[in-house]
Amino acid sequence: MKKIGIIMLLCMLAIGVQAQEERCPLHYEGSFSMGASSKDLSFMGANIDLGYSPVNRLSIHALAHSDFFIPKLGATKDYNNAVNLGGGIGYQLLNNKNWRLGTLELRGTLTTSLGSSTYKNTSYGVGLYFYKHSNAQRFQPVIGIGFNARNFHGNVPNFYGPYVSLGIRF
């Protein structure tokens, strides 16, 4: 009787297990981004993105990025950087099921900087990101292009310009 109970319990637990073809709704991305020059200022930085897909095409993102701002005159100091935290939302325009090449996702983000810095800012961004889903690979390359608007809170002029992002998704 005990054996039958254990077998029944194990069978009931196995019913809820998903097959290997199912994708985990949680993903991480690490990337480097670089923006075009605007008003004698350009930026580059490192990004960390924690994403969750509650439904098939929609994703919610928590972002952290550290940006280094480069003035045209080249006067770089330690205070030319800012650390931003924020979030975003994404929608898969083309997904791997309908398009064999991979997934094309449209994302909108909003971040704000932490601490006191000359380059304290609020950042608004929209971008297209391409990545390939593969069951054979744990790491997929991510390529993104988009437009970023930064509203600086100090004497620095606001920044508007395109950016390119390259990274790894796992």
Where in this protein do the model-derived segments appear?
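Cleavable N-terminal export/targeting peptides
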Residues: 1-26
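Short glycine/proline- and aromatic-enriched beta-strand/turn motifs that initiate or cap beta-hairpins
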Residues: 19-68
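Transmembrane beta-barrel architecture of outer-membrane proteins
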Residues: 27-29, 43-45, 82-86, 121-127, ...
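Solvent-exposed loop/turn segments connecting transmembrane beta-strands
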Residues: 33-45, 73-79, 112-122, 151-159
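Gram-negative (and chloroplast) outer-membrane scaffold detector with strong preference
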Residues: 49-141
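Outer-membrane beta-barrel "beta-signal"
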Residues: 89-93, 157-170
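Membrane-helix boundary connector in multi-pass membrane proteins
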Residues: 131-133, 148-154
